[in-house]
Swiss-Prot record:
Keyword Signal: yes
Organism, scientific name: Aquifex aeolicus (strain VF5)
Cited PANTHER family: ENDOLYTIC PEPTIDOGLYCAN TRANSGLYCOSYLASE RLPA (PTHR34183:SF1)
Gene assigned in the entry: rlpA
GO cellular component, one term: plasma membrane
Pfam families on file: DPBB_1 (PF03330)
UniProt GO molecular function: lytic endotransglycosylase activity
Leader sequence residues: 1-26
InterPro entries according to UniProt: RlpA (IPR034718), RlpA-like_DPBB (IPR009009), RlpA-like_sf (IPR036908), RplA (IPR012997)
UniProt-recorded name of the protein: Probable endolytic peptidoglycan transglycosylase RlpA
Keywords on record: Cell membrane, Cell wall biogenesis/degradation, Lipoprotein, Lyase, Membrane, Palmitate, Signal
Covalently attached lipid (S-diacylglycerol cysteine), positions: C27
EC number: 4.2.2.-
Single GO BP term: cell wall organization
NCBIfam families found in the cross-reference section: rlpA
Length: 226
């Protein structure tokens, strides 16, 4: 888990001003998705040499590729290979395969990794903006698993999109009232014709669209994928 280190400083007049600013800003920002970065190609190298080891898990994990990318891993020691989907886990170093594959592939090795598919659907680059109509979903889906594998929480600033890579951050603007919210793409949808984005209850409330149900929107891509 990430650790945050605190420190103490004498509180002078400047310190009080800074402290009040931090308190006020923390009250106005509910989401933890604050980072704003450039739009970039998702991490999907066509070929790479990566350290491959094993974990007592059902799935394969990596910190090197977009979530749900599919790769071919070759052990140069014995020529054996495996095709497998990878799940993103930033605590993992290299690629961690299910332990059941050790008998076939052999001891941990520096593997040759070939990209078969970037992410869930092959999207390597996000557009700078998306526009259309957004709807929202909440209680009925609260606690259910999303397409990305995490549990849907209607009180988080989440979104569903048909093809943007999971982990993508969007700054969504309600074109009816100008209100904005930053959301994270964790699910697929919407599948209703004429709709382009599904937002969680919390995000919809922030945008003031609960009563409207569907609103015209514009979204700026702050981060493409994880």
């Amino acid at each position: 888990m990430e650790r945050f280190l605190g420190f103490r400083t004498p509180l002078g007049a400047l310190g009080v001003v800074i402290l009040l600013t931090l308190i006020l800003s923390s009250c106005s920002v509910k989401t933890s998705y604050k980072e704003k970065g450039r739009v970039y190609n998702g991490k999907c190298p066509e070929y790479a040499k990566v350290w491959v080891h094993y974990c007592p898990t059902k799935y394969a994990y990596t910190d090197r590729y977009q979530h749900l990318s599919k790769v071919k891993i070759v052990n140069p020691r014995n020529g054996k290979s495996v095709k497998i989907s990878l799940r993103l886990n930033k605590k993992v170093r290299g690629i961690c395969l299910p332990k059941r594959l050790k008998k076939y592939l052999g001891k941990p090795f520096l593997g040759k990794v070939y990209l078969l598919r970037c992410g869930e659907n092959g999207v390597k680059k996000c557009p700078k903006y998306i526009r259309g109509y957004a709807s929202w979903y909440g209680g009925k889906f609260h606690g259910r698993k999303t397409a990305s594998g995490i549990r849907f929480n209607q009180h988080e600033y989440y979104a569903a999109h048909r093809y943007l890579p999971f982990g993508t951050l969007l700054e969504v603007k309600n074109l009816k009232n100008g209100r904005k919210v930053i959301v994270k793409v964790v699910d697929r949808g919407p599948y209703v014709r004429g709709r382009h984005l599904d937002l969680s209850y919390a995000a919809a409330k922030k945008l003031g669209m609960i009563r409207d149900g569907v609103i015209p929107f514009e979204a700026k891509v702050l981060r493409c994928g994880y």
